[in-house]
Amino acid sequence: MKELKLKEAKEILKALGLPPQQYNDRSGWVLLALANIKPEDSWKEAKAPLLPTVSIMEFIRTEYGKDYKPNSRETIRRQTLHQFEQARIVDRNRDLPSRATNSKDNNYSLNQVIIDILHNYPNGNWKELIQQFLTHVPSLQELYERALARDRIPIKLLDGTQISLSPGEHNQLHADIVHEFCPRFVGDMGKILYIGDTASSRNEGGKLMVLDSEYLKKLGVPPMSHDKLPDVVVYDEKRKWLFLIEAVTSHGPISPKRWLELEAALSSCTVGKVYVTAFPTRTEFRKNAANIAWETEVWIADNPDHMVHFNGDRFLGPHDKKPELS
């Protein structure tokens, strides 16, 4: 029965118009988990629980004996669930569409149209329902994207350009850095050279929202992947300072180790480097204070007019002295 159910799941996915790499065994197992269909179940029993990726993997392991290792989670998410979402087979975070892209509570669920199709498989009018579904996919996708767009975080860059980031506390702090920190501490000669989006680091359709590779190259900054760059990079053309800003909501601040990593990566940079750790609140700052490197700066979004200076010889600016490793 297990192999029969897998074969049926793959037949449904193929009929839904998915390419071969999305009606393979992995995608078939995932569809069965999303529908909560066990080997002996009828498709009329299909449901739409809210399932994180780990729960999908657990269902497949428990009910079908297919044991995906923990490091397969990203493959399932990026090569099956993401495509299911694009094809309008699943909704992500139906319970809270504004949930952050990198939240541990992200979940996936089949939408009602797909459930209706499954309930009519294999003896009902499931093929007719699929044809109706495929006819309306473009308009369904448009409605879905419009709903997601309502929760995106708008940012007006220093040159007036408008962009938007995926929802979440981390990207909100990116917006606060641009709107609140830069006018106060960088000034009107500031130029945004890099802003990341949490969706890009998870390969979920986001992108490097701003990446001025040519300007960075002109400053002696070599090509760096998004996981090596700080979250926001701003250049003050007047003072010739490069602000390297780490936004902290879950991962760590500019610690001595991170400082040394960045110094090594930016050894060819021809301008002064100013390291800043940004926090959303004092509470978050207090949790991380012991790990912050000397000769760096701290900015807290809910007290935007002030900075905390982890240095002794100047108010703000580049430093040649290396921080002590504790």
Swiss-Prot record:
Report the catalytic activity.
Endonucleolytic cleavage of DNA to give specific double-stranded fragments with terminal 5'-phosphates
UniProt superkingdom: Bacteria
For the protein in the UniProt heading, the enzyme class is hydrolase
UniProt keyword list: Endonuclease, Hydrolase, Magnesium, Nuclease, Restriction system
Q: Name one GO molecular function term.
A: type II site-specific deoxyribonuclease activity
EC number(s) stated in the UniProt entry for this protein: 3.1.21.4
Family annotation (InterPro entries): BsuBI/PstI_C_sf (IPR041963), BsuBI/PstI_N (IPR041454), BsuBI/PstI_N_sf (IPR041962), Restrct_endonuc_II_BsuBI_C (IPR009528)
Q: Which Gene Ontology biological process is one annotated for this entry?
A: DNA restriction-modification system
One Pfam family in the UniProt entry:
BsuBI_PstI_RE_N
Q: Any keyword Transmembrane helix?
A: no
Query: Which coenzyme or cofactor does it need?
Result: Mg(2+)
What does the record note on quaternary structure? Answer: Homodimer.
UniProt lists the family membership as follows: Belongs to the BsuBI/PstI type II restriction endonuclease family.
Specify the protein name.
Answer: Type II restriction enzyme PstI
Q: What lineage, starting at the top, does this entry show?
A: Bacteria, Pseudomonadati, Pseudomonadota, Gammaproteobacteria, Enterobacterales
Identify the coding gene.
Answer: pstIR
